[in-house]
């Protein structure tokens, strides 16, 4: 699978299977990449616009995670035209070695930064709802800035192996230039699989399994707290309760649906070097992997639309800003943006992971009714 432009940690499991007929769609996949590029640049650009148009006094701690997530997605989607071209040319890379290294590196920086930001937002929402008073200091704006900086540094460091090992070389028949992971500088041909499996499995653990476990834990306690609140308070019955809890479920499930197929198929294929899958199963994994990758990439353009769909306040803020610009008004709809910041964070957990961020410095956020305002009309 060395000529596969999707598995950025390599995937040559040295199997004896015949992959001669393997060929992902040269039309569908590039089209999806370009669609994600167009929607992702527009949507994430709008997210950044709405966040930074809000006055500094009105911003909440979650806003820095939201903006950071949009930056990560935006940084990634701008590389998609390169990968669309690579796929359309049947894995012939015309852009040189440096662009191969850099674009691959940005993909992994995005993956790590996105899931770390989503985890940070989930933890921020946990603090806002479950432990609002005792942990109020952790949700100050400055703490969010420091945490975000640390997350970006960690993401950049974790992606370094891609920058180091990614390279270009002629294919076996010499007709194409491939952009692939080359471990020859540190391993023999017989031990390269160990590097591939080690880096691939570790990226799945750090970039999916551990963050997803943390997010599930946060949402479990959030759901418990909300359910307990509804038992104690007289609220409008089960309809609002159902809606509030269903939004939380959507945040976690969407993250899993976008990224689990990619990580699962990648890990299974790489483990084929150790477990020796039957050829039919091995070829099946290779065939579905490009499409699993497409699903995970869609996450980078999906988050803004999920905000708009699930959060009327964010939708209203965007509409107000657009209308305001068209009419030439000078004011910034602070109230809409501020409301967006709170509810927005809940919707963002779609992507590479659920990001729930509420954040905010106000001590009165301790009450669950605040969360209800945030997530429910």
UniProtKB/Swiss-Prot annotation:
Inducers of expression: Up-regulated following myocardial infarction (MI) (at protein level).
The protein's assembly and partners: Homodimer; dimerization inhibits APLNR-mediated G protein and beta-arrestin signaling pathways compared to monomeric APLNR.
Domain notes: The hydrogen bond between Asn-44 and Asp-73 is crucial for beta-arrestin signaling induced by APLN/apelin-13.
Protein name, entry field: Apelin receptor
Compartments reported by the entry: Cell membrane
Chain segments annotated as transmembrane: 29-52, 63-84, 98-123, 145-162, 197-221, 245-268, 288-310
Membrane topology: Multi-pass membrane protein
Record topology, Extracellular segments: 1-28, 85-97, 163-196, 269-287
Residues on Cytoplasmic side: 53-62, 124-144, 222-244, 311-377
Gene3D superfamilies: Rhodopsin 7-helix transmembrane proteins (1.20.1070.10)
Any one Gene Ontology molecular-function term assigned to this protein's record: apelin receptor activity
Disulphide bond pairs: 17-279, 100-179
Family: Belongs to the G-protein coupled receptor 1 family.
Alphabetical UniProt keywords: Angiogenesis, Cell membrane, Developmental protein, Disulfide bond, G-protein coupled receptor, Gastrulation, Glycoprotein, Membrane, Receptor, Transducer, Transmembrane, Transmembrane helix
Biological classification of the source: Eukaryota, Metazoa, Chordata, Craniata, Vertebrata
Known role: G protein-coupled receptor for peptide hormones apelin (APLN) and apelin receptor early endogenous ligand (APELA), that plays a role in the regulation of normal cardiovascular function and fluid homeostasis. When acting as apelin receptor, activates both G(i) protein pathway that inhibits adenylate cyclase activity, and the beta-arrestin pathway leading to internalization of the receptor. APLNR/APJ receptor is also activated by mechanical strech in a G-protein-independent fashion to induce beta-arrestin signaling leading to cardiac hypertrophy.
Region of interest (Disordered), ranges: 334-377
PANTHER family listed in its UniProt record: APELIN RECEPTOR, CELL ADHESION MOLECULE
Site for Required for APELA and APLN/apelin-13 interaction and signaling, residues: 83, 166
A GO CC annotation given for this chain: plasma membrane
Compositional bias segments (type: Low complexity): 335-349
């Amino acid at each position: 699978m060395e000529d596969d432009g999707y598995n950025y940690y390599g995937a040559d499991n040295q199997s004896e299977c015949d992959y001669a007929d393997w060929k992902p769609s040269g039309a569908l996949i590039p089209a999806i990449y370009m669609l994600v590029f167009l929607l992702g640049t527009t949507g994430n650009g709008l997210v950044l616009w709405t966040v930074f148009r809000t006055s500094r006094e009105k911003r909440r701690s979650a806003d820095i995670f939201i903006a950071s997530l949009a930056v990560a997605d935006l940084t990634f989607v701008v590389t998609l035209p390169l990968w669309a071209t690579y796929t359309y040319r049947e894995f012939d890379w015309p852009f040189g070695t440096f662009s191969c290294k850099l674009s691959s590196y940005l993909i992994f920086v995005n993956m790590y930064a996105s899931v770390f930001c989503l985890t940070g937002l989930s933890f921020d929402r946990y603090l806002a709802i479950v432990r609002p008073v005792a942990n109020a200091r952790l949700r100050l704006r400055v703490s969010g800035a420091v945490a975000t900086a640390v997350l970006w540094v960690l993401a950049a460091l974790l992606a370094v192996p891609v920058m180091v090992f990614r390279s270009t070389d002629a294919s076996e028949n010499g007709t194409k230039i491939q952009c692939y992971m080359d471990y020859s500088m540190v391993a023999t041909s017989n031990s390269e699989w160990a590097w591939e499996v080690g880096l691939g499995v570790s990226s799945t653990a750090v970039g999916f399994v551990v963050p997803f476990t943390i997010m599930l834990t946060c949402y479990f306690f959030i759901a418990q707290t909300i359910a307990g609140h509804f038992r104690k308070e007289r609220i409008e019955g089960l309809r609002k309760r159902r809606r509030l809890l269903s939004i939380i479920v959507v945040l976690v499930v969407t993250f899993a649906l976008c990224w689990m197929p990619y990580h699962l198929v990648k890990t299974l294929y790489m483990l084929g070097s150790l477990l020796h899958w039957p050829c039919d199963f091995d070829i099946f994994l290779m065939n579905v992997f490009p499409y699993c990758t497409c699903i995970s990439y869609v996450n980078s353009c999906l988050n803004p639309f999920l905000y708009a769909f699930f959060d009327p306040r964010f939708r209203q803020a965007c509409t107000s800003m657009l209308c305001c610009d068209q009419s030439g008004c000078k004011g910034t709809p602070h109230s809409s943006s501020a409301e967006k910041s709170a509810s927005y964070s809940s919707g963002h957990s779609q992507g590479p992971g659920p990001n729930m961020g509420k954040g905010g410095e106000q001590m009165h956020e301790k009450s669950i009714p605040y969360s209800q305002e945030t997530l429910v009309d």
